């Protein structure tokens, strides 16, 4: 499932809106949602990962409002039942959730019904498409380029960005094929889009809102998309293959009145720009990941639906998604996406506290952009306005957070210290060196870390929410972010135990040992869960505050602090943790362990130095029992063994009973004479009751005697009617009596009878005799 999450960037306008599902899971569907959390507009299916169906990740389709090349998913998206989030969830891997799936469909938030969306979108299509384009254009990197091309080059054929398209494209398909694909025979369309149609039509049925024509349109668009070269960079993506604006193509492809611009929701341009910084990073990764995935397997399409649920829900989702994103992302793909995103995020943030804005880059294995950004938690990497406000509010926290963030790199566990470190994921400790640009991963990491992780996530949620809210919601999210930030400082106060400067120092120290520390950090995470939280991670209240649920962190923080105090048993891990967290290590000397476990604190498993001394036994003075001493020098296994063969001389042997004659007998051969004597039992044996005749009987054959008994009923038969004629019957069996047998001519009354009429009898005899002579 190395589906690039990066390609799936959830464009969340608002801290309140939050993308559901890992971007990775959600395929290339970037859900651009308004602050209102309108899933219809918000769900911008970025055809980036429509590739699952198209076989290509089409940033271009995403560019074209994710519509320029309506994928089967786009077409089917409207069809997806809004009330079947579970369906979509199941479909996400293969039944790619149509890009048009609403948040409700995705199973999150209240999304206008497909019909409502259709009504709204029909009117909004042009505008929303434009806005979306602007948003995408605002996005730096392939997306912005693709959007620009989409909006700017309506005539240009859509070039599928993802290798998936290429994989699905018939060989030889290229930009030329793109147009050819439009006009390509329905066979090609059906072949390429067969998968999409199969999935799409059922979805359409579910939606029931798509017109039958949608399939064909989608097929055409898809064929074009698929035919378009995979490798074409997202920037190449042009609006519709037909040269229509991406929105138009999208509409036609979708053919869904409700989803003309399924993802098209007018998003604040600044938000798009903010997201764009995030997206470019994710996008670079997206195409590569998309290609790999496209070739390997259709990406799972997860829809990031920005919802405006209460922050806690977002936090819970974000934790889950972050957990998924953190570990699910292939380390290779994730890092690539994160690298760019981190760079961009850093640029955008350019805030003194890169740790907050750029939590240690989540290990590349964890795509940042792909993880749905929680409204509260994910600060769009472009932290305009609110980002700075959050920073101000968090300055105190930031120092600790920075240290914490840096710690997460060192030890994935430590991401808890930095609320913005969500990117740091225990799954890839070595990758930690890049601070994750988005707090998403931190949240995922914190979620994994258990209670301490949750607390951290809460803090992250506060920080991330403020940060993310700023990019998404523009100024208002920023304010929310500030409020969150203010909250976070209160939560983070426990972190202040380590001065900000010390925290930053710790952060600096940790980054180099990121690999080992992360490894160590991961065990601490388990420790945190167990209550041990590594000193570093508990020490930083920021991690606690990360958890979106702000109210809980304060209560949890003290626990974490206590946990942090427990130093790790391994000195190296303890050192790294101490560096990361200025919190003094608890004195183990004063601690009484259960069952004297402290005694073994320094125990080094694997055995100490064991000396095996081989002492030779002096057997010279030993007295053996029963004279066994003679064999004391016996070497088992036989030394030189001599087998003496003495031929036996039988010449002088006398045999018993004259058996000597057979002494030279060679068994198994010689001349064998078999004499067979036939015994004639007839001569010697007297049979019982004359059975001797059958003594030579050969069963199943031989001479058989067939005895035939003549049935004389005909001869005795009398005619019912007196016809006065004599019936002569010649028996088929040849007997000594060749004369034909006379069947008496009997009248029913018996008036004519051989006995009664001797004349007739004589006549019959004469006739029969004459006939017999003639051979009749």
Swiss-Prot record:
Phosphotyrosine found at? 18, 29, 532, 729
- One biological process term in Gene Ontology: microtubule cytoskeleton organization
Keyword list, A-Z: Acetylation, Cell membrane, Cell projection, Cytoplasm, Cytoskeleton, Isopeptide bond, Membrane, Methylation, Microtubule, Phosphoprotein, Repeat, Ubl conjugation
List of residues that carry N6-methyllysine: 594
Post-translation: what modifications?
Polyubiquitinated. Requires functional TRAF6 and may provoke SQSTM1-dependent degradation by the proteasome.
Q: Compositional bias (Polar residues) at which positions?
A: 61-71, 736-751
Q: Which residues carry this modification: N6,N6-dimethyllysine?
A: 480, 646
Q: Which GO terms describe its molecular function?
A: microtubule binding
User: Acidic residues bias: where?
Assistant: 217-228
Q: What name has this protein been given in UniProt?
A: Microtubule-associated protein tau
């Amino acid at each position: 499932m190395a589906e690039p999450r990066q390609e799936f960037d959830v464009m969340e306008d608002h801290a309140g809106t939050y993308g559901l599902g890992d971007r990775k899971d959600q395929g290339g569907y970037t859900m651009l949602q308004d602050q209102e959390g309108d899933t219809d507009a918000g769900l911008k299916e970025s055809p980036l990962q429509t590739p699952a169906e198209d076989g290509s990740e089409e940033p271009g389709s995403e560019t074209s409002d994710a519509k320029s090349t309506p994928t089967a998913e786009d077409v089917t998206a409207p069809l997806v039942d809004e009330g079947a989030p579970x369906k979509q969830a199941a479909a996400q891997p293969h039944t790619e959730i149509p890009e048009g799936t609403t948040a409700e469909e995705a199973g999150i938030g209240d999304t206008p019904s497909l019909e409502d969306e259709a009504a709204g979108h029909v009117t909004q299509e042009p505008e929303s498409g434009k806005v979306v384009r602007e948003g995408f254009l605002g996005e730096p990197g392939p997306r912005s380029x693709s959007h620009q091309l989409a909006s700017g080059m309506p005539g240009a054929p859509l070039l599928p960005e993802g290798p998936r398209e290429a994989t699905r494209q018939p060989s030889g398909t290229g930009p030329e094929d793109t147009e050819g694909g439009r006009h390509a025979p329905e066979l090609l369309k059906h072949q390429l889009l067969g998968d999409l149609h199969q999935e799409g039509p059922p979805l359409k049925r579910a939606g029931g809102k798509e017109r039958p024509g949608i399939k064909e349109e989608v097929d055409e668009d898809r064929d074009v998309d698929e035919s378009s070269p995979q490798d074409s960079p997202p920037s190449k993506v042009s609006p519709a293959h037909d040269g229509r604006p991406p929105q138009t193509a999208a509409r036609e492809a979708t053919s869904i009145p409700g989803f003309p611009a399924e993802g098209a929701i007018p998003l604040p341009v600044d938000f798009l720009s903010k997201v764009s910084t995030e997206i470019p990073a994710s996008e670079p990764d997206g195409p590569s990941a998309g290609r790999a995935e496209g070739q390997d397997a259709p990406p799972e399409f997860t829809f990031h639906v920005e919802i405006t649920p209460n922050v806690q829900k977002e936090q819970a989702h974000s934790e889950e998604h972050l957990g998924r994103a953190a570990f699910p992302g292939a380390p290779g793909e994730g890092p690539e996406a994160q690298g760019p995103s981190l760079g961009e995020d850093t640029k955008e943030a350019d805030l003194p506290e890169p740790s907050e804005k750029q939590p240690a880059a989540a290990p590349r294995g964890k795509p940042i952009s792909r993880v749905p950004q929680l409204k509260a938690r994910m600060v769009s990497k472009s932290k305009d306005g609110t980002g700075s406000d959050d920073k101000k509010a968090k300055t105190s926290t930031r120092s600790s957070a920075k240290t914490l963030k840096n710690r997460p790199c060192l030890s994935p566990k430590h991401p808890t210290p930095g609320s913005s470190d969500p990117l740091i994921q225990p799954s890839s400790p070595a990758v930690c060196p890049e601070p994750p640009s988005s707090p998403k991963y931190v949240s995922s990491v914190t979620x994994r870390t258990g209670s301490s992780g949750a607390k951290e996530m809460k803090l992250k949620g506060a920080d991330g929410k403020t940060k993310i809210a700023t990019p998404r919601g523009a100024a208002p999210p920023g304010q929310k972010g500030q409020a969150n930030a203010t909250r976070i400082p209160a939560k983070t106060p426990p972190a202040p135990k380590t001065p900000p400067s010390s925290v930053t120092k710790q952060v600096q120290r940790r980054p180099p040992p990121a690999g080992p520390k992360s490894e160590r950090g991961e065990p601490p995470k388990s420790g945190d869960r167990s209550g041990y939280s590594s000193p570093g991670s508990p020490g930083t209240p920021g991690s606690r505050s990360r958890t979106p649920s702000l109210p809980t962190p304060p209560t949890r923080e003290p626990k974490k602090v206590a946990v942090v105090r427990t130093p790790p048993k391994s000195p190296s891990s303890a050192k790294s943790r101490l560096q990361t967290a200025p919190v003094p290590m608890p004195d183990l000397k004063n601690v009484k362990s259960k069952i004297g476990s402290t005694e073994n604190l320094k125990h080094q498993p694997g055995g100490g130095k064991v000396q095996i001394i081989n002492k030779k036994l002096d057997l010279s003075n030993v007295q053996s029992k029963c004279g066994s001493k003679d064999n004391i020098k016996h070497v088992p296994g036989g030394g030189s063994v001599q087998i003496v063969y003495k031929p036996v001389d039988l010449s002088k042997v006398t045999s018993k009973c004259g058996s000597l004659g057979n002494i030279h007998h060679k068994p198994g051969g010689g001349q064998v004479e078999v004499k067979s004597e036939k015994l004639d039992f007839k001569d010697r044996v007297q049979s019982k009751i004359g059975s001797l005749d059958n003594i030579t009987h050969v069963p199943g054959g031989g001479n058989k005697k067939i005895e035939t008994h003549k049935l004389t009923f005909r001869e005795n038969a009398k005619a019912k009617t007196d016809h006065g004629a004599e019936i002569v019957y010649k028996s088929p069996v040849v007997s000594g009596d060749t004369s034909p047998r006379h069947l008496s001519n009997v009248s029913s009354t018996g008036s004519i009878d051989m006995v009664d009429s001797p004349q007739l009898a004589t006549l019959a005899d004469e006739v029969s005799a004459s006939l017999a002579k003639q051979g009749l």
